[in-house]
Design a protein with these regions (language model features):
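Glycine-/charge-enriched secondary-structure boundary and capping motifs
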Residues: 1-24, 45, 65, 99-124, ...
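Glycine-rich phosphate/pyrophosphate-binding loop regions near the starts of catalytic domains
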Residues: 11-165
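Short, acidic (Asp/Glu-rich) active-site segment that either coordinates a divalent metal cofactor
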Residues: 51, 151-194
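Short glycine-/acidic-enriched loop or helix-start segments at secondary-structure transitions
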Residues: 60, 137, 174-175, 268-270
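Short pre-catalytic strand/loop immediately N-terminal to key active-site residues, enriched for Gly-Thr
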Residues: 65-69, 179-185, 202-203, 245-247
Length: 305
């Protein structure tokens, strides 16, 4: 079994580069192989940038999922932040930290999952770095663009707004609880871009740490409270029915969009037609200290510390 230490840094970089199409896209002026990537941005656009760290033992466990699945989830988690801003993706940077004795096949499958998932969503891998470390980890930086001043933001909510969420929640948490992760969500990139044109759109955030936790972040940024109806929260299908309510409320890694709309804006049916996705109204924003009301005691969400 060949290990990373058997091939060295530059050979490993070359092997990862082979996972990327030689012509990554018209917006990529310079891709992998130079000191930095060069990406084209249209006139009248703002650059959107986000970074996520994905660390073995904290964010993924290779005894519960394949390296490729872990890599796919890392890419989706980073791209989902672009979706929450309503941005179109431009490129992805990957900083990979690898223990020297890691099997080469493990690292390449992990990178293959990242590069493949990014390409699937129109986001070429355009550069990065490889370093030695004690634990396998990936730090991804996603770059996107949005019309100047038109990015969706989590601080645009107002008391009286109605709250909506796309898709269904809880499947990723359900699989983690069972010790076998196979499901990989999808970043709602197209839906985020379409949301920017919705009349009365308020705040927006992606559901990465759990519905309740992320709604709490939206409330803090917008300086409002929220009240949700747990019975209306859409729960993902599971064997024998639906995932438990607590996992839909606090599970995390759903990568759906949670957003608010002014009272005079469209309802769930019109939003479904606009976004091309299931959309459910789950509550509203209210005046008051930043907190989520209406939930049973217990559900919180993922925390790094």
């Amino acid at each position: 079994m060949r290990r990373v230490s058997d091939v060295g840094e530059f050979d490993l970089i070359e092997r990862i580069a082979r996972l990327v199409p030689r012509r990554p896209g018209p917006g990529v002026r310079v891709g992998i192989g130079d000191d930095a990537a060069v990406l084209g941005v249209r006139r009248g656009e703002d650059l959107v940038a986000t970074t996520d760290a994905f660390v073995a033992g904290d964010h993924f466990r290779l005894d519960q999922e394949t390296p490729r699945t872990a890599g796919r989830r890392a890419a989706v988690g980073c791209l989902s932040d672009l979706a929450a801003m309503g941005a179109r993706p431009l490129g992805l940077l990957l900083a990979l930290a690898v223990p020297a004795r890691t099997p080469l096949a493990t690292v390449l499958d992990f990178a293959r999952g990242i590069a493949g998932e990014a390409a699937r969503h129109g986001t070429p891998l355009v550069g990065g770095n490889v370093a030695r470390a004690r634990e396998l980890s990936a730090t991804l930086t996603a770059l996107g663009a949005v019309a100047r001043g038109r990015a969706l933001r989590r601080d645009r909510g107002r008391a009286g707004d109605r709250l909506f969420v796309t898709g269904a929640l809880g499947r990723s948490a359900f699989e983690r609880a069972r010790g076998s992760v196979r499901h990989v969500g999808a970043p709602r990139l197209r839906a985020g871009q379409r949301l920017r044109g919705v009349r009365g759109i308020g705040a927006c955030i992606d559901v990465s740490d759990g519905l309740v936790a992320d709604l709490g972040q939206l409330c803090r940024a917008s300086r409002v409270a929220a009240r949700i109806e747990p019975a209306r929260v859409p729960r993902a299908a599971a064997r024998g029915g639906r995932v438990p309510e607590r996992l839909a409320l606090a599970g995390g890694e759903d990568y759906e969009l949670l957003f608010s709309v002014r009272p005079a804006g469209p309802g769930a049916a019109a939003l479904r037609r606009r976004l091309g996705l299931p959309v459910t109204e789950i509550g509203r924003l209210e005046a008051g200290p930043a907190r989520v009301r209406g939930i049973p005691a217990g559900p919180g969400g993922f925390r790094h510390f």
